[in-house]
Amino acid sequence: MTRTTSQLNELIEITRDGQRFYQHAIQEVKDARLQRLFQSMAQAKTDVINALAGKVAANHEDPATGGTLLGKLRQVYADTRATLASDEGATYVAQLEEAEDRILHAFEDALEKGAPETQALLRAELPKVRACHDQMSQLKHSLK
């Protein structure tokens, strides 16, 4: 596996963590507004994953199909906190915002240290990643 593929697959896995977390949260929250938002965010993650996977496949490599252990642990942690919290929606929003932080930092790090052949793709996807991050961050702060 090339360095480029490895880097892109890592971003795919981290982004998939977010996608799966949003999909899970849709089932857990009762607020229809949050469910719609989480669905939109999950779709945004799917779009980013597809763009990254397309680049990996174009290099005749196999795109990552899973997530990370850290992503799964964060989801379990959020479930536990939501069970104990009085406002499950705010708990999921806070944990999803942290997932967005992780995704954003991974993309920024990849842009800074990544392979030159991925720069254009990462620059194209970064505004989408940042927009999701900013939206969840604003929502988290509005719920405090």
Predicted feature locations:
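Charge-rich, acidic-biased intrinsically disordered regions
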Residues: 43, 61-79, 121-128
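Conserved alpha-helical segments that form or flank metal/cofactor-binding pockets of metalloenzymes
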Residues: 36-70, 135-139, 143
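Acidic/histidine-rich alpha-helical segments that form the ligand environment
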Residues: 7-27, 72-123
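Amphipathic alpha-helical hairpins/coiled-coils and adjacent low-complexity
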Residues: 50, 57-60, 64, 101, ...
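Terminal, compositionally biased segments
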Residues: 1-3, 20, 36, 58, ...
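N-terminal first-folded block
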Residues: 29-31, 56
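Alpha-helical scaffold segments that form or flank carboxylate-/histidine-based iron centers
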Residues: 4-11, 32-51, 89-93, 118-129
